[in-house]
C-alpha cells in the first residue's frame, strides 16, 4: 500500500496578527500552531504520522505566505526514505512568498536508508520584497547504528525560481562521489542553509550576513568542512559536511539564529520543539 498525502498551508496577515489556514488529505497535517514570538510570527509543526516513505509514496506540500505575513514551519523528526522495492518515494514542497512576507522552512533532516529510491524536492517562488530562510540537511544511512547507505539513489532538487537551482543525484555505489576528496570525502551528512530574497540584497546586508556566518563557522569544529558564500545577488548560502547529522544541524541552527538577528532584527530563539 502506498500513500499520497497532501497539505495546503496559507499564511495571511490580519491586522497585526499572522494567521494560517490549512487543508490536508492523507497522513500529513499541522500538529501545533504557536505564537512564541508574539502575534506577528506564526510557528507551525508539520507531522507525517507514518514516519517514513517507501516506493510509491508521495508527500506534497503547497504553501503560500501572503503579503506581510511571517510563517515558520518545522517538523518533530526526520523524514525517512526507507528501502524501495518498486517506484520512487517523493517529498515535495512548493512555496509562494508574496511581497513583504517572510518564510522560514526548517524541517529536520532527510535520511536516505539503504536501498532507497528517493526524491526530495523544494521549490520557492519569491515576489519582489519577499524573503526566506530554509535549509536542506541530508543523512546518508545511519553510520552510528552501523546501517550504511550502501545501495540506492537519493535525488535532491532545491530551487529559488528564476534565481538559483541545485540538483543532485547521489548514488550509493558512486565511490568517487561518496569518498573522494572532491566529493563527500567519506562524510555522510551534508547541509545547506539558504537565505533568499525576491529582490537583490543590499551589499551591506550581504556583507553583514556573510561576516556573521563566517565568524560562526570559524569557531566551529567543522570549520574545515564548511563555507559561506553569495552565488547570486539574491542568495546567501552556508554549506557543511559532517560524519553524522548532529554537528551539521547544530552549526546550521547557530547560523540561522545569527542571520535572523542580522537580517531581520529578530531573536534567534529556537522553536521549543527543538529542545525536546
Where is each model-derived feature located?
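Intrinsic-disorder/low-complexity, polar/charged segments enriched in Ser/Thr/Lys/Arg/Asp/Glu/Gln
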Residues: 58-60, 119, 190, 235
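N-terminal, charged/glycine-rich beta-strand/loop interface patches
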Residues: 1-109, 114, 121, 261
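A structural signal for small-residue-enriched, beta-sheet-centric alpha/beta enzyme cores
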Residues: 138-276
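Short, hydrophobic/aromatic beta-strand segments
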Residues: 73, 132-136
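A short, polar/proline- and glycine-enriched secondary-structure boundary/capping micro-motif
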Residues: 29-32, 82-88, 115-117, 143-147, ...
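Short, surface-exposed recognition loops or helix-turn segments adjacent to catalytic cores
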Residues: 108-110, 135-140
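N-terminal intrinsically disordered, cationic/polar leader segments
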Residues: 1-25, 90, 96-105, 117-119, ...
